[in-house]
Amino acid sequence: MKVRNIIVFMIVFLMSTFMNVSTIHAESGSRKGSIQIVYKGRNELNQEVNLSDAKFSIYQVQYMSTDTLTWKDNFKDSHISLEDTSAEAREKQAKQLYKYAQQKDISCSLQETNTLGRTTFSNLTQGIYLIAQEGSVESGKSQFESAPFLVEIPSLVDGSVEYNVT
């Protein structure tokens, strides 16, 4: 079914992202970053399509304070450990944090992807962010839905410290 294609695509996308990204800690500072989402899928003809009008929410769950990641007040009682930084653990943590955010009705910023399937969350302070798709999006006869995921600003990508993460 089409949902299977969506799940397979998102797993491959997330795994490739997490394989190249590991957690780093930077000194507390005023440097800002961004997270760009490029949302694509495969239609019923197995052709790559840009997924426009997909709504993504972003929550800052931790911030950098004196070279230490500190829980934001609205997430500090979640009792979810972020110590394990493996891809599998991060996937589980993101799902748990998103469920917690929904249960506690935590406010977030929301953006939609454009016709190229892109959106960018800018001016982000150092910390860990939870990103989740709100609902699903259709393209042709296929329906697409992304699993929640975590991104750290800055991130270590292929040996380089990156403040602007795609």
Task: Describe the residue ranges of each PLM region.
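Solvent-exposed loop/turn and edge beta-strand elements of beta-rich ligand-binding domains
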Residues: 1-166
